[in-house]
Amino acid sequence: MTSAVAMRFMAAGAPRSPDIHLLESEAGHHLFVANGSRLFDVEPDLFARLGAAIAADRVSEVLSSIGVGEPPLIDDAPLPAPPIHALSLAIAQKCNLGCTYCYAQQGAFGGQAKNMPIETANRAVDLLLAEAGDGGKASLAYLGGEPLVNRPVLQAVTQRAAELAARRGIALSFSITTNGTLLSQADAEFFETHGFAVTVSLDGPREVHDRTRPYKSGAGSFDRIMRNLRPLLACQCRMQVSARVTETPENLDLRRTLDDFVAAGFYSVGFSPMLSAPGGRGELQTADLVSMLDGMVDCGRTFERRLVAGERYPFDNMVNAMREINRGSHRPYPCGAGAGYLGVSADGELAACHRFVGDVEGAMGTVAGVDRDRQAHWLAERHVHRQAPCTECWARYLCGGGCHHETIHRGRPACEYIRGWLHYCLTAYLRLLRKRPDWFDAAAGATGQPS
């Protein structure tokens, strides 16, 4: 695969109308309507008519004439502040690695290295369960820094939270994002007991990972991590162990990385572009994003082939895209940050998400209570209709405007990449819907495992 593939998808994804997007696939001609994220098969004559309507600025008229010109499903009104249903605790604002691009600035978020006291963690849990209410659902995540630096507090808080949730009939799920260097057999047993979703940060094969995620001494960390992971990968029943790969200019061989980690036994493998880093180190530039899209499409096409053949291929980005398209995902925000999801610093300060810990841009109160005024302001300002370039983009309700942290601190350098990826995903969806409709019916294919 060459960059010509990525450039073709980027060109095909370019916004010609904020209301519709036209696609062609092996199955024919298709219309994507931004309002409601609806996808239709259309006859060639209507396809041509819609293309002409874009050029003549008459899209609304044509949509109304064919019966899909409904009133907007998303207006300019910000989302009313919902109850908090998910918290991520920066339970250790310290780390034993010296990752070259770390947004948390080696784990301490630009401040003094510290652990979260158990009293602060318990207050955060109390806030979460109070917001969830009896019989509700909630999620508790542990991040850092490296959360296992503060293992005793993590374990005690988890056990207490599980007991309190059970008494109140709250379905509470747990997750952790770890660098993997401190994992042990005992951790595997603990995570399995509590059904943790474990995400391990890995940047590729040894020679790549050790350049971008070394110890602070400069020594490589890959071999130790893979040894530590063996007991976790071997006992995935209630627990799920996934790999998260941060893409920098150092590690753009996505297909090799995906195949290696699938073979290692991970529940899922996902890629995330590095778009905003302190000092800019490791950030992807335009040429890098073209290379990444090449790799993503290569992995996506492999996913298509494997899925049609009835084989498991847990490419998380592709699985999520297929599920989002299938259910008509349609949202005014990219995620729940600042709404139902907040981050908590080691000192008990609330932030819009884990990436805004210690950042005044995303301050949201303390574990004593959410600052509803700041939250309301955030939800008003971060609405996709308030993001100038997004209002002219057909993909705005699939994308939601892009990661808040990245767009606030760097802008939107990846829009062409995102649209190119979504254009490919829409065509892949149309193919798979015809070849494997049962996979979508099951809707449980969170890892690409056929029913």
Regions found by a protein language model. Give the residues of each.
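Radical SAM/AdoMet-radical enzyme domain recognition
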Residues: A121, V125-A141, N150-M274
